Amino acid sequence: MTVVDVSFEVRCERLPRDYGYALYEALAGALDWLEDEASAGVHPLHGTAAADGELFLGRRARLMLRLTEERAERSLALAGARLALGSGLEVGAGKVRALMPYATVHSHFVNTGCADEAEFLARAAAELREAGLPERMISGKAHAMSTPEGELRGFSLLLHGLSPAQSLAVQARGLGQGRKIGCGIFVPHKSVVAVGAD
C-alpha cells in the first residue's frame, strides 16, 4: 500500500487557532469515507497567529492530506469546496505528491496520551520499537488541542538517523493518536536543529 500526500491550495481570511477538530469535522462532511479510513491523516495548517486567538493563512498555505493512493485520487474532488471553518475555507486545486525519504523527519504535535514529557518519550519509544523503527528522537515544544472528549496534550518530535525505508515507513504510519486532527504526522526536516522553535 503506497501512501502519498495531497496538497490543496486554500483561501481563508481567518481560522480559530485551535482548529484541528473543526477542520476534521468539515473534511469528514465533504469526504464521506474519511471517518472510516483508519490510515488517513490531515496535516496541520500553517499560518500567522494573531493576538485575538485567530490564525491567518497566507497565500502559500496548503491543506495537506496523507492518504493511500486510491483515496488520494478520490480526495481531489474536494477542489471547489467551501468548508465551514472560521470565515470559510475555500479549497482550490489539488496535487498528489510522493513522500520523500529524508533521514530526519519532524512532527509538529505528537499525542501519546500523556502530558508528562518523560512518559511521552517512553511511550513514543515503545511504539517505535513495536514498529521496528529506531528510537533516535528529540522532543520539543509542548502543545495542546481541544476535542469534544477533552484536551489533548503532547510535544513536537523529531526522529533522526532513519534509513530511506524507515523514513517512508514512519511517514506512512505516523505516531501516537489523532492523525485526522493533525497529530503524529511526520514531514522531512533538513537537520537536527532547534526542534523546540517550530
Please place each PLM-identified region on the residue numbering:
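RNA-interacting cores
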Residues: 1-198
